[in-house]
Amino acid sequence: MKSLQALFGGTFDPVHYGHLKPVETLANLIGLSRVIIMPNNVPPHRPQPEASSAQRKYMLELAIADKPLFILDERELKRDTASYTAQTLKEWREEQGPDAPLAFIIGQDSLLTFPTWHDYETILDNTHLIVCRRPGYPLEMVKEQHQQWLERHLTHTPDDLHALPAGKIYLAETPWFNISATLIRERLEKGEPCDDLMPESVLNYINQQGLYR
């Protein structure tokens, strides 16, 4: 049996401990063999990143240089068109084969808006969903039909994530770090310290490049 892998996507503008530490804890809790970090290029539903694709990629390389759990995947950065999760996960499934257990990591806030994502119905055909719980967010979907969808796929044991290739939703108890890329950009713009929010190597690069000023 192949070991469970997970994909973790985002803008990472910039990458920080709020991205890395919960996922490291998650990997230990449920037994992830590796986590593929995938920065996106043109998020269809979000403002454009302040740092360039090359700069965001390099900051990620610095952040995970001493973390063998993580592997960087550049495929979305190389696209000239908008990045859609459903398309990426379909490609990943085709590469890994039909039987490999695969998961996609999202935050609880993203779960609540998940039914608005492009082709969201197809995502569980290709992967599991691992949801990192966040304080202040409800555990129920807005619409009853979406709540029924959640309950139909919900599992309370990570064993299912290893035993099945796709199709389950697992709510994980991960630590919450009150850090956001927006907060970091605001602090950097004001000249406030960010030493405790991100790896030193990333902060040094930001300062060298004069980013987020």
Swiss-Prot record:
Name the Gene Ontology molecular function terms of this record.
ATP binding; nicotinate-nucleotide adenylyltransferase activity
Origin superkingdom = Bacteria
One GO term under biological process is:
NAD biosynthetic process
Pathway linked to the protein: Cofactor biosynthesis; NAD(+) biosynthesis; deamido-NAD(+) from nicotinate D-ribonucleotide: step 1/1
Q: Which InterPro entries match?
A: Cyt_trans-like (IPR004821), NadD/NMNAT (IPR005248), Rossmann-like_a/b/a_fold (IPR014729)
TM ranges: none
First-tier enzyme category under EC: transferase
Statement: the UniProt record of this protein carries the keyword GTP-binding = no
Keywords in alphabetical order: ATP-binding, NAD, Nucleotide-binding, Nucleotidyltransferase, Pyridine nucleotide biosynthesis, Transferase
The EC number of this protein is 2.7.7.18
Spell out the reaction equation it catalyses.
nicotinate beta-D-ribonucleotide + ATP + H(+) = deamido-NAD(+) + diphosphate
- NCBIfam families with a match to the protein in the record: cyt_tran_rel, nicotinate (nicotinamide) nucleotide adenylyltransferase, PRK00071.1-1, PRK00071.1-3
Give the protein family: Belongs to the NadD family.
- What HAMAP family does the record point to? NaMN_adenylyltr
- Main function: Catalyzes the reversible adenylation of nicotinate mononucleotide (NaMN) to nicotinic acid adenine dinucleotide (NaAD).
Protein name in the entry: Probable nicotinate-nucleotide adenylyltransferase
- What is the protein's species of origin? Citrobacter koseri (strain ATCC BAA-895 / CDC 4225-83 / SGSC4696)
Organism phylogeny: Bacteria, Pseudomonadati, Pseudomonadota, Gammaproteobacteria, Enterobacterales
